[in-house]
Structures are given as structure tokens and as C-alpha cells.
Amino acid sequence: MISSVRNCGTIQRFCTTSISLLQKPVEENIVRISNQVMVKFDPNSHLRSLINAGNLRAARQVFDKMPHGDIVSWTSIIKRYVTANNSDEALILFSAMRVVDHAVSPDTSVLSVVLKACGQSSNIAYGESLHAYAVKTSLLSSVYVGSSLLDMYKRVGKIDKSCRVFSEMPFRNAVTWTAIITGLVHAGRYKEGLTYFSEMSRSEELSDTYTFAIALKACAGLRQVKYGKAIHTHVIVRGFVTTLCVANSLATMYTECGEMQDGLCLFENMSERDVVSWTSLIVAYKRIGQEVKAVETFIKMRNSQVPPNEQTFASMFSACASLSRLVWGEQLHCNVLSLGLNDSLSVSNSMMKMYSTCGNLVSASVLFQGMRCRDIISWSTIIGGYCQAGFGEEGFKYFSWMRQSGTKPTDFALASLLSVSGNMAVIEGGRQVHALALCFGLEQNSTVRSSLINMYSKCGSIKEASMIFGETDRDDIVSLTAMINGYAEHGKSKEAIDLFEKSLKVGFRPDSVTFISVLTACTHSGQLDLGFHYFNMMQETYNMRPAKEHYGCMVDLLCRAGRLSDAEKMINEMSWKKDDVVWTTLLIACKAKGDIERGRRAAERILELDPTCATALVTLANIYSSTGNLEEAANVRKNMKAKGVIKEPGWSSIKIKDCVSAFVSGDRFHPQSEDIYNILELAVSGAEAHRFDCTLKRAFGVNLYS
């Protein structure tokens, strides 16, 4: 310990002496150490030693006191600032070098470093001026300058300029090839990335492990498992298969291409696994809908002492949301806090999505308001969460807040607001969102367009919905389905069916949602035979397995036609797990037809699935009442009271100025409820005075106010 302290003191004295010597002429910089050895002091060596030691402040002091820096000293100090991610200071120093020290001309080394600084700081204007300088001074012929220039354009998202620089480079090496392939793949241009990879393979440059890994990522993006297997063969030949980054990319490629078993086999055979290995498997399970497997994999990962990263938690919160496991999500939230990842934007967004999906909007809102920074995903998530939960007023408030923050809305945020406008039949609010979509150039977005059609249809303006549909592309399946559904809901079944038939003639391939819409049109128009025709078409012509929603349409169609026995038979023969929706459809039909026994059976099936279902109990009581079985009806209502079952009241909404308010019967939660009820009582009492006169007028045709 004592010797270490002495050494530190010696180093400190040496550094102090060195700095003072820099103030003397170079020829006087001779130091006698221990009165025995004579050494000449080299400022650049001392500068590099300070830089290598990570002491940037001392290095800058030494540099500033140097009477005349050369290209080596300038490059050293600029490079250190770039390494420290202080690109702005690096660019200032480079500018000073060119202005103050005319004797020093930039070379390939310093130009490469400064181009990297431009990429880090996204200073594209400065970078382009350096590009021009490199062309003018013929420094662009250097493979290092070319690679740095290529990388700079790639970093700022100008991948086409990167490709142009690459094509003009007289010499290329493995780093250059890998840089252009990486840029293309990260930009989502997987096919071009693989084209460059093929050219590289044909050249004399050999791919390294990272090049193979990025090429496998391109295969995954294109779902090109055949090409991926070919690369896998090359990886085996080169002996890279045990390299962790390559093994991870191989496993990810197979799972993303649907070859889950091959990906799992690679994962099991890995000699070592890191967070990327585990996370890719978790993501793969989540992608194919096996969320429970994803959770089990996460537990194994934690037991393996591998700490999760942001992507791991984002995938896990998504899995919990899909499973509606709020408790699991809350436990993960505790893990995030313990690992200090709560400031991660992607983690916060995924947590907020989980809370919203699981119905805990209070926690989602608290999380949102506590975020240090927010992106458009944050805003879209909180707006969508409130809108999808039926709290349109809160959704619009958050949207207004987002607009005040200057954040540009996404298609998802606009679609959520259009959905809530349609559900609450607030056409003025929907039109304002439509205007915003036009303002931000999102009106041609498929999601926004279909949401506009739905909104106008639900608000009763089928004409405006039809006008928007007339401007859509023919192959927009979502908008077509929305329009068919809009016609069906407006009782325009003929228009809905005609549109569907017309689309089939032009080669349109319907999906399962389209068939739900057209079956709904058949249901509303009572076209039983045509409904069965389409129901069979989706299975025989398009090889689609009917979902429970399709069966629900057919059960409704049979019930409306009075064929309750056939409807019950279809429900019992369903391959899907029976839910309360189809049984409720049958129960309501039994009420209309007075079919007590079948209605009781339907109610029993519903109560097996949900013992506290108010709709089933109320409808069953009404069936008994309408058929004179008052004692049975009373027993059902007593049973409801004993279980604490309360029928959920219906609600209405009203828009006053820019505020939408939703309310139920007897609602007193509005801040101005006392004033509202006072005015209502005045209106009722005023109407009561004219009630008798109005009755006389209706009875005898006498106008008492003439």
C-alpha cells in the first residue's frame, strides 16, 4: 500500500513537471531524472498517456498550453472527445484547427474521427461540407474516410447517400461491406442488404461473425428461411456456429421464420447464453401466442442468474397483457424498479400498455404522469387505453394535452379517438379528428381510413362514410370490411351484399372479419339461405375455419328466422368453446318467442360460464313474467338480490362546446350536478302545468293557445 502511494506521488510530480516544461522552448525540454538519465520531453506522448488514462481534463490543459500542435496532437484530443460522446466539442476543436493553425492540414485519420462526430450529433450539414472537402482534397480515396462517411450517412438515416458513397469508393474492406449491409438491414431494406452480402461473398473480402449475424437478421426480416439455412451452412464451414452473436442470430432467424423447433434446438445446444439468447426465445413464444411458455422461459432465465434488459421486460409485459395477468405484471414492475430500469422509455410504455389492457387505468395514468420523457408511443398508449375502456372524455383530454405538447399524433391515436367518437355518436369530435388527419397527411392511412368509415357509420352519416370509401384503394381489405359493416348496421343489407359480391368479381380475397360483416348483413335482412351460402363459402372456397363470431352470426340468423331448435343444435355442435354471447343470443330469441324451456337451458349455460351475469338473470325473469309465471320470475329476482347481482345501467353522452360528458340514470358525479338537477326540475314543473291542456288538445283537437 505504501509503495503504491509513493508511486502515485512520483507520477503526480512527473505530470506537474511536464506541464511546466511545456511553457519553455522545445530545445530546453531536457529533464534530469535521479541525476543519472537524460530524456527529451515529448508533448504528444504525454498527451496520449493522459488520454489513455482517461484524464480528459488534464489532457485538455496540456493541449491548450502547447505552443504549436501538430496533426497528431489535434487528432488525439479530438478523438478523445468523440470517444467521450462529446461530439460538439470535437467539432469545435476541428474548426479551430483549420482556422487557428494553418500549418496543420486535415489528414485521413482526423477526418474519419470528425465524420464520426457528425454522425453522433446528427450534424448532417457539417458532415456534407466535410464530404465536399474530402472530394476536393482526394481524401475520399481512403477506405477509412469512405467508411466513416458511409457510417455518418447511415446514422442520420440517409441510407441512399451511404449506398452512393459505397458505390464510388475505389477500395473496400470487410468493415466497409459490413457497414453498408448493417445500414440497409437496420433501415428495413432487408432484400438490398442480402444483395450486398451476396456481392461481398463473391469478392475476396471474407465475412466476419458480425456480418453473418446481420445477414441472418435480414433473412428473419424477409422470412427467408431457405436463404438463412444457406448462411447457416457457411457459418458451420467457417467455424462460427459456436460464436454467441451468430448463434443468437441463427436461433432468432429460425423462430421468426416459423421454424420454432429448429430455433429451440439451437437454443438448447448453446454452450453459453446471454440476455439476447433468452429474450429472443421469450419474444418467439410471445409471437406464436404461447405467452405462458414465455413466462416460464423468463423464470428459467432469472434462475440462470442472467439479468433481463429493456427488451426482455417489454416482451414480458406484453405477455402479461395478453394473459390479463395484472398480478404478474405488478411483480415484473417491482423487478424493473429493483434493477433501475424504470426510466427506460420502452419499459415504461410496455408497463403502461399492460396496466391499460388489464383495466388498471389509474396505475397507467400515474405511470404516464411520472415519466421524465414521453414519445408518441407513450401518448398513443394512454389515449388508446382510455378510449378502448370506454372513457372517451379522458381520452380526448389526453389528446388535447398531447397537442399542446407539440407531439404529432400517430395513426393509432387518431384511430382510437375516432373509435370513441363513433361509440359515443359524437360526430363533431370525429370531424375534428378527421381534420387533424388531413392536416398531418394521415387520411390515406389504412387504419385511419377504416376508422373514419366506422365513425361516420356509427354516427349515422353513412353518406360521408361512403364518400371516404370511394377514395380508398381497391385492395384495402380493412376499409372494405368497414364499409360492408356500415351498410349492414344501417339496414342497407342489399348495398352491403352487392359491395361484397362486386369485390369478389374483381379478385378480392375476403378475410374472416369480412365474412362477419357480410353475415351480419344477411342477419339484418333475414336472408337465411344466402347466409348459409357465405358460411359454407368461407370453409369450402377460402379454407377458413369459422370462428365463434361467425357461429354467433349464424345463430342470430336462425333465431331471427324462428328456428330456435336449429340454433340450439348449432351451438351444441360448435367446435369452439361456447361463450355467453351465443347463448345470450338464443336466450333473447327465446324471450321474443316465449320459449320457456329452451330459454331456461340457455340461461343455465350462461350462468355456468358467469354465475353473476345480470343479463341472463334479468332476461330469464322477463321470460317467466311474459308467460305468466310470476312466481318463477320472483324467485329469479330474489336469487339476483342474494348474489348481489345488479344490472349494469345504460349510459348516454352529450357534447357541450368541446366537452363530452357521459352519464347514467340518476348520475350525480358531474361537478355541476346540483345545477343540472335544479334546471331539470324547473323544466319538468313547467311542463307539468301544460300537461292537462295538452291532453285536452290531443283528445278534442282544441288549440287553447290560439
Swiss-Prot record:
Top-level taxon of the source organism: Eukaryota
Region entry Type E(+) motif, spans: 658-688
PROSITE patterns, per database record: PPR
Paired cysteines (S-S): none
PPR repeat start and end residues: 39-69, 70-104, 107-141, 142-172, 173-203, 208-242, 243-273, 274-308, 309-343, 344-374, 375-409, 410-444, 445-475, 476-510, 511-541, 547-577
Region of interest (Type E motif), residue spans: 582-657
InterPro entries noted in UniProt: E_motif (IPR046848), Pentatricopeptide_rpt (IPR002885), PPR_At4g14850-like_plant (IPR046960), TPR-like_helical_dom_sf (IPR011990)
GO MF annotations, alphabetized: RNA binding
Alphabetical keyword list: Repeat
One GO BP annotation of this record: RNA modification
One Pfam family per UniProt: PPR_2
Family stated for the protein in its record: Belongs to the PPR family. PCMP-E subfamily.
UniProt name for this protein: Putative pentatricopeptide repeat-containing protein At3g47840
Organism: Arabidopsis thaliana
